[in-house]
Amino acid sequence: MWLLLSPTRLEAPFLEGEPFAFLAWRGLKGTGFVYLETGIGKVNAAMALAAYAARNPVEKALLFGLAGAYPGGPSLGEAVLVEEEVEADLGLKEGLAPLGFPALALGERRYFNRFPLDPGLTGELARGLGLKVAVGLTRDLVSETPEEALALARRWGASLENMEGAAFARACLALGVRGAELRALSNPAGVRDKAHWRTKEALSALARAVRRLLAEEGGARRPPG
């Protein structure tokens, strides 16, 4: 059973199920999945996952949605899996490490600004769906110019930017949830002129990937014979 999450319902119009409400969030219950619309931004994404996981068992979770493409990154309209998220607006310009304390500590492992998604689940999905993997960058404030986007991409080695991924990845680590992230590139990061965006193509790529994921999940659950 998948817990599916997206920042907005705009990114999930293809999902069909029984509407329900969970605390402050709206969602759907369908075959092989529960879906929640988290709302935009880091706090919303982390709260939705943590609140749901506190009251319900979560086998695996997928955050999916649109993202901005950095120069040299994935093509517009392409869907990719995110293997690691960078929280680029936490701490100093160079991150938390110069300050000497982590954002998250699990045993001997300390995480500063980089948070991996579940590598096994991500690899499994990449092979099954035939998708590339990339490094994502998360900020509550998106890039407003191409120059700003390029500087962030170079500083952190990221291929795309969004507003939720690092919070989701960090919450998954803290809660022990196997998490994966799927993003489709709708626009060049830092370009606000929507004439250069490819939102329709990106939404179609998201729909294809999530539908295939759910179809394969259904096949895996179907008894032989």
UniProtKB/Swiss-Prot annotation:
Key word Hydrolase present: yes
Q: Does the keyword Hydrolase apply?
A: yes
Q: EC number(s) for this protein? A: 3.2.2.26
| pH-activity relationship | Optimum pH is 4.5.
Pathway(s) served: Quinol/quinone metabolism; menaquinone biosynthesis
UniProt catalytic activity:
futalosine + H2O = dehypoxanthine futalosine + hypoxanthine
Question: A single GO CC term, please?
Answer: cytosol
The alphabetical list of record keywords is: Hydrolase, Menaquinone biosynthesis
Q: How does activity depend on temperature?
A: Optimum temperature is 80 degrees Celsius.
Activity regulation, short description: No enhancing of inhibitory effects are observed with divalent metal ions. Slightly inhibited by hypoxanthine.
Functionally, this protein is described as follows: Catalyzes the hydrolysis of futalosine (FL) to dehypoxanthine futalosine (DHFL) and hypoxanthine, a step in the biosynthesis of menaquinone (MK, vitamin K2). Is highly specific to futalosine since it does not accept aminodeoxyfutalosine (AFL), or any structurally related nucleotides and nucleosides as substrate.
Q: Which PANTHER family match?
A: 5'-METHYLTHIOADENOSINE/S-ADENOSYLHOMOCYSTEINE NUCLEOSIDASE, FUTALOSINE HYDROLASE
Matching HAMAP family, A to Z?
MqnB
**Subunit and partners:** Homotetramer.
Protein family according to the UniProt entry: Belongs to the PNP/UDP phosphorylase family. Futalosine hydrolase subfamily.
Put simply, this protein is called: Futalosine hydrolase
> Lineage of this protein's species?
Bacteria, Thermotogati, Deinococcota, Deinococci, Thermales
